[in-house]
Amino acid sequence: MGGASNQPTQCETKFWITPLTHIRLTMPAVVSVERLGQGPMPTDSPFLFAVHHLDTYPAGDAKMAPAASLRGHNMGADFGHADGWSMYHGEEVPGFPKHPHRGFETVTIARRGYVDHTDSLGNGGRFGGGDVQWMTAGAGISHAEMFPLLDQAKPNVLDLFQIWLNLPKKNKMAPPTFKMMWAETIPRASPQVCPG
């Protein structure tokens, strides 16, 4: 993602993947690196949108909402990061209440904190701690992504990436699907650095 200033070089990289032993891949070197920050990042096709949310929410209350003043937060459209966190489109619990998507896929990686997902296919559940959700909107899906504040004694950190991938024209009206990849089942890769 991001604009490339140089052509990538090729090298053979050995990846150690657990629980497998190892594989060898020939792949391009990193094309560009973007500073990790709050909000959208530059993208190139087929990436439509990539965003990083890093919020340090206050302790939660019994409704999983912030047990703190909402003064300075633009309720319903809060992206200002006042006090180190945003409510986004949430009115009580932070997050994104029910909204539609069509013609693309979303990949959501919840590194820390939790996401409560519900959708028009009847799926629902909570994920976090390294879990990955892959949703194909295709012909259309409505879903909600809310960030419950479960800890009532200390701050609730949310560290989340979401990437939107454009579907090719022939797949834009594909049936919508939803898949979870739980952290403990995702192989981990540790690359050896190519000689430079």
Regions found by a protein language model. Name each.
Residues 7-10:
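Low-complexity, intrinsically disordered or signal/transmembrane-proximal segments
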Residues 12-109:
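N-terminal, Lys/Arg-enriched amphipathic/low-complexity engagement segments
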Residues 100-115, 134, 164-168:
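Short, conserved beta-strand element in jelly-roll/cupin
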Residues 105, 125, 131-133, 143, ...:
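Generic beta-strand structural signal
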Residues 107-129, 138, 142-144:
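A short beta-strand-loop-beta hairpin characteristic of the jelly-roll/cupin
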Residues 137-170:
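Ligand-binding loop in jelly-roll beta-barrel domains
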Residues 159, 166-196:
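Conserved, well-structured core segments that form or line functional sites
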